[in-house]
Regions:
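Catalytic domains of carbohydrate-active enzymes, especially glycoside hydrolases
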Residues: 121-137, 329-330
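Glycine-rich beta-strand-to-loop/alpha-helix junction loops that act as flexible
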Residues: 136-139, 143, 264-267
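Conserved, mostly hydrophobic/aromatic
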Residues: 99, 126, 130, 174, ...
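Phosphate/pyrophosphate-binding loops at sites that engage ATP/ADP/AMP, CoA/4′-phosphopantetheine
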Residues: 128, 245-260
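Glycine-rich adenosyl-nucleotide cofactor-binding module
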Residues: 75-113, 117-128
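N-terminal accessory interaction module
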Residues: 1-84
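Active-site-adjacent loop and "lid" segments of alpha/beta metabolic enzymes
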Residues: 1-31, 90, 106-122, 141-170, ...
Length: 337
């Protein structure tokens, strides 16, 4: 079976580019005037043809229906996320500020755990600086991190969620466990950010559908406790694209509304430096999935690998560069420290 993909490759900041007409990607601030139409059979790319907008549109009647869907998805305008009393627009980049209340996160483990006033002050500072959402996590998902009992995770997360909800902050909870999702929602959380894409806990899909809260589905090759395991790709970009398409479809089949699904290619999760860079360079392709995109590359290992093994707290320059790369690719949500 032949699979097709449309990758925008000539980006501009207006409908008119030097190369001619450009189309608006995902209703945002980025336009594209050239597109690669990629054909794949048996896991291998068999053709890659370059088109301008007019030529590609003229070819559409002769191409399979999935190409029509991808073309429409690339231009799909996303409705804002409704997060409690807050509305987060998706026609411009938005920031998720990371708040880890863990003892062992790779970047800031222990800094905010058991220090509620310090955690709240940091969250307030991020919101004041412009973060649209505060993303609270009670479990480290770095390589080799031990699993956390859901009761401990709830004890870490819920008090902070309650306090931030009282402040009127839009809150995301970063968890793989349905019990934590339930407790966080009851405490005032507005969004579930699941690094397992609702695979880890058999109750998660049903819970997300029942609550109606938006969800972030992230790619990770592993299952169970080790999300970084089983990393084997034929073409990392297209493999991740196909995987996210399946998780999107599983969420839709479970009853999660389409305008409640955000997709994340999972930078740094079970991927080599080359894999991560390939994904960063191909981010515009993922708009063809028809969902808002989230990218979290802040302070991650790939930055250290490119910056003379700089430790996590000295990766600001690389974090900014990758955030800007995501922004110029039309990514709507940037998860940052």
């Amino acid at each position: 079976m032949t699979r097709y993909y449309i990758r925008p490759i000539a980006l501009a900041d207006s409908p008119q580019a030097e190369e001619g007409r450009a189309v608006r990607l995902a209703g945002g601030l980025v336009y594209a005037s050239r597109f690669a139409l990629i054909a794949r059979e048996g896991g291998k790319v068999v053709s890659r043809d370059l088109f301008d907008v007019a030529t590609l549109e003229a070819r559409l009647p002769d191409l399979p229906v999935e190409v029509h869907e991808h073309w429409a998805n690339l231009q799909r305008v996303h409705t804002p996320l409704r997060l409690g009393e807050r509305t987060v627009r998706l026609d411009q980049p938005q920031v998720l500020g990371i708040l880890n209340v863990t003892p062992d996160s790779f970047s800031d483990g222990g800094e905010f755990m058991d220090r509620p006033e310090v955690a709240l002050a940091h969250a307030a500072a991020m919101a004041e600086a412009g973060a649209a959402i505060i993303d609270i996590g009670g479990e480290s998902t770095r390589p080799g991190a031990p699993g956390v009992w859901e009761g401990d995770e709830i004890a870490r997360v819920v008090p902070v969620v309650e306090r931030l909800a009282a402040m009127g902050v839009a809150i995301s909870v970063d968890t793989r466990r349905a019990a934590v999702m339930e407790a966080a929602r009851a405490a005032g959380a507005h969004l579930f950010n699941d690094v397992s894409a609702l695979r880890h806990d058999p109750r998660s899909l049903e819970l997300a559908a029942r609550t109606g809260l938006p969800v972030v589905l992230m790619h990770a090759p592993g299952e169970g406790e080790d999300l970084h395991a089983n990393a084997a790709y034929g073409d990392v970009v297209l493999d991740v694209f196909d995987w996210l398409a399946k998780r999107r479809d599983a969420a839709l089949a479970a009853g999660i509304a389409r305008d409640r699904i955000v997709l994340d290619p999972g930078i740094g999760f079970g991927k080599s430096l080359a894999d991560n860079l390939a994904l960063m360079n191909a981010l515009p392709l993922f708009h063809a999935l028809g969902q808002p995109l989230l990218v979290g590359a802040s302070r991650k290992r790939l930055i250290g690998a490119l910056a003379n093994e700089a430790p996590a707290d000295q990766r600001l320059g690389g974090s900014l560069a990758l955030a800007l790369k995501a922004m110029e690719s039309g990514v709507q949500l940037l998860r940052v420290h």
